[in-house]
Amino acid sequence: MVDKLLIGRKLAQIDTYLKQIGDFSRISLNQYKMNWKTQRIVERTLHILIEACVDIANHIISDQEMRLPTGYADTFKVLMENKVIGKNLCETLEKMARFRNVVVHQYETIDHTIVVSILHRNLRDFQKYKKAIIKYLSSQEDRR
């Protein structure tokens, strides 16, 4: 059975992180490049936002006995295959997972343009993910 309390905590964390990073959502590329503290705050917050999404996905995948993902990006593909999230959101989250891998393993090569683009265009995708997870959990309750 899906642990709704665990998922609820993770969804609340996503809200908290989105509020925190929202202060940077209108930053210019030049402002971002010039401030290493902002870079670290944004990179780390994006990292833990993505981790929270992956944690939720892995919990659902395990509980529902879906196929095991081959990596972080594939986690979202498994959710799409099982109709938890749609194709467009899946593709966006796969890119986010690959970005997460760069932040964690190749941090010296982070492209500031990509980070600022995420800030400007993709923060709302985390909200879409939250809504999809809540909808999925609700549909699972309706089946009982």
Segments predicted by a language model, with ranges:
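Solvent-exposed interaction patches of small proteins and small membrane subunits
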Residues: 1-144
